[in-house]
């Protein structure tokens, strides 16, 4: 019930339309029931009495009722279809709005393909069910109730047969309905698995083809599809059992009723018109039960889809936005890490940082070096408050960042990653992502400062050239300069660089380095360094290993005081020397 209550909350803004729909539904059901009386008049007064005038009146009555029923059906169908589309759109928007605010830890334990399936497939299913199945269920319920009342008015003895049959019919509905609901949830989960798998393969299609794994991936995908089909087959089987059982029981009861009623007509205990009207109401009642049995499975699917969507909508955000009175822009651009210990939620027994302390002064350049898994990228995540440490604190200026609004904090920070993220869209859109209110002139100025204008102007449509998915139409160096232009446009006070030149050729590296030098000027900068030659200019170099800070100093100081740094320097500079001698 809580799931359905959550769904009904999305209908509250449209109460007027809901009430008009219900009025049209009740009106249409009432008109439909009146047709049974028209049928009785046609038989008793038109046929039995052989009166043309009475027949004409009865036919006119039926035609008027049919016209009213058509008008009511139009209003009912339009409104419920509109509500289905509107509510599914509102749910989709609400879920997406909540998802983009969730902490990154949520996405460690929830696959993107599954989330996409819920946003698309489940909301589409809800739209179909609200716009169709709910209407059928309500109409069938009202028709069933109204037909039962008319049956009692027409003939109590025959109604007794129908009333006895109803509980018998409801038994398979309840038994199979529970199974259908469970299997519907499993089916939707398995379909989401298929979507997740396909999305991952398509995203990494070059790697798949490079390793000639097409045949293996086809087989693996086929296994996922067949697994989803197996669950769907069980669900369909249960629904088929439900429908077959209901039809058999309903029409069995109708047959018994016809036999008793026909006998009464032969004996003169009731008129042919009364029997005709009774048959009409009985069929209406039987149709209502049959429709309910069919729709019941759809409604169970709706419950499953709603559960999956509500899980996303009510997922708790561990990094809360607070109404802080502190103006972040007035705080000094100083970062102070105090005794940090942090484990990722997906690896709670494996600390990524242990008792880590470091102070980064305003406008200074700090480089982080160390082997893979040392905790360098984790620091970037914590600075942006994607996670909160289990122990210790991080201060921006003299304020603990837990006391700051995460959005306001992130407004002060820009990141340039080793593999920059670009979105499907044109150059202008991707650079303006750093500052949505920026004018075209400001975007172009940032591109010029990032040494990106020289290649952007050569693109087919200049700044309005589409970059493709993830910027696939640009080289690595070009993508980096777009990312730097975006960071320049944001004009942050703290800059995080994840070795932005490590994967570039010499010419691209030179141009990117020029852009980075301009970007770092006058900003507190933290660099993750994979190549020590790129950070010799840093004010301080911090050596990390196993989540701990093991040394800190200048390049020359660390060569003497840190065996780990000296070993890394020897390996890298010796390799560079060998490469230089060979060329």
Where are the regions a protein language model picked out?
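Membrane-integrated ABC transporters
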Residues: 1-31, 35, 47-61, 76-80, ...
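An intracellular "coupling" helix at the cytosolic face of ABC transporter transmembrane type-1 domains
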Residues: 13, 104-105, 121-130, 134, ...
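Transmembrane helices of ABC transporter permease
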Residues: 13, 17-28, 135-186, 257-270
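Alpha-helical segments in transporter systems
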Residues: 16-37, 58, 62, 80-81, ...
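Helix-loop-helix
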Residues: 51, 150-164, 238-307, 312-313
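Conserved catalytic Walker-motif region of ABC-type ATPase nucleotide-binding domains
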Residues: 99, 221, 309, 337-339
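ABC-type nucleotide-binding domain
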Residues: 322, 329-583
């Amino acid at each position: 019930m809580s799931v359905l209550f959550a769904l009904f909350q999305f209908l509250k803004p449209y109460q007027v339309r809901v009430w008009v729909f219900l009025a049209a539904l009740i009106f249409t059901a009432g008109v439909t029931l009146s047709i049974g009386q028209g049928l009785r008049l046609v038989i008793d007064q038109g046929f039995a009495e052989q009166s043309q005038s009475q027949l004409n009146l009865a036919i006119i009555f039926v035609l008027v009722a049919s016209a009213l029923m058509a008008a009511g059906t139009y209003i009912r169908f339009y409104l419920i279809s509109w509500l289905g589309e509107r509510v599914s759109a509102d749910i989709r928007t609400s879920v997406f709005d909540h998802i983009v605010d969730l902490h990154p830890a949520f996405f460690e334990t929830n696959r993107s393909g599954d989330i996409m399936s819920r946003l698309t497939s489940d909301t589409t299913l809800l739209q179909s069910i609200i716009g169709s199945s709910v209407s059928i269920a309500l109409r069938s319920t009202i028709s069933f109730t109204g037909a039962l009342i008319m049956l009692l008015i027409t003939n109590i003895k025959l109604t007794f047969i129908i009333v006895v049959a109803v509980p018998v019919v409801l038994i398979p509905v309840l038994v199979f309905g529970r199974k259908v609901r469970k299997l519907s949830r499993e089916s939707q989960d398995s379909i989401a698995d298929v979507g997740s798998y396909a999305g991952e393969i398509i995203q990494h299609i070059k790697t798949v083809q490079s390793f000639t794994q097409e045949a293996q991936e086809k087989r693996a995908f086929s296994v996922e599809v067949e697994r989803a089909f197996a669950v769907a087959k069980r669900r369909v089987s249960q629904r088929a059992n439900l429908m077959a059982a209901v039809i058999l029981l309903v029409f069995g009861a109708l047959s018994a009723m016809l036999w008793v009623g026909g006998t009464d007509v032969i004996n003169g205990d009731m008129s042919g018109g009364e029997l005709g009207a009774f048959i009409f109401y009985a069929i209406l009642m039987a149709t209502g039960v049959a429709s309910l049995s069919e729709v019941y499975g759809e409604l169970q699917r709706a419950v499953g889809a709603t559960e999956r969507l509500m899980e996303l909508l009510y997922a708790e955000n561990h990094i809360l936005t607070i109404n802080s009175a502190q103006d972040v822009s007035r705080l000094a651009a100083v970062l102070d890490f105090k005794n940090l210990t942090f484990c990722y939620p997906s690896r709670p027994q494996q600390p990524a940082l242990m008792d880590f302390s470091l102070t980064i002064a305003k406008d200074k350049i700090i480089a982080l070096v160390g082997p893979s898994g040392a905790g360098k990228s984790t620091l970037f995540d914590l600075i942006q408050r994607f996670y909160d440490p289990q122990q210790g604190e991080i201060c921006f200026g003299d304020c603990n960042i837990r006391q700051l609004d995460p959005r306001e904090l992130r407004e002060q920070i820009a990141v340039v990653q080793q593999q920059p993220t670009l979105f499907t869209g044109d150059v202008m859109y991707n650079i303006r992502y750093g500052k949505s209110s920026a004018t075209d002139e400001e975007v172009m100025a940032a591109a010029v400062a990032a040494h990106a204008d020289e290649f952007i102007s050569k693109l087919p449509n200049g700044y309005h050239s589409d970059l493709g998915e993830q910027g696939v139409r640009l080289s690595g160096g070009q993508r980096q300069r777009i990312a730097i232009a975006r960071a320049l446009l944001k004009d942050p006070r703290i800059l995080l660089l994840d070795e932005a030149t490590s994967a570039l050729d010499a010419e691209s590296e030179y141009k990117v380095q020029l852009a980075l030098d301009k970007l770092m000027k006058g900003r507190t900068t933290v660099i993750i360094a994979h190549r020590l030659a790129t950070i010799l200019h840093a004010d301080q170099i911090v050596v990390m290993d196993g989540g701990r800070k093991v040394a800190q100093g200048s390049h020359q100081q660390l060569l003497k005081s840190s065996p780990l740094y000296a070993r890394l320097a020897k390996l890298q500079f010796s390799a560079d020397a060998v490469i230089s001698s060979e060329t």
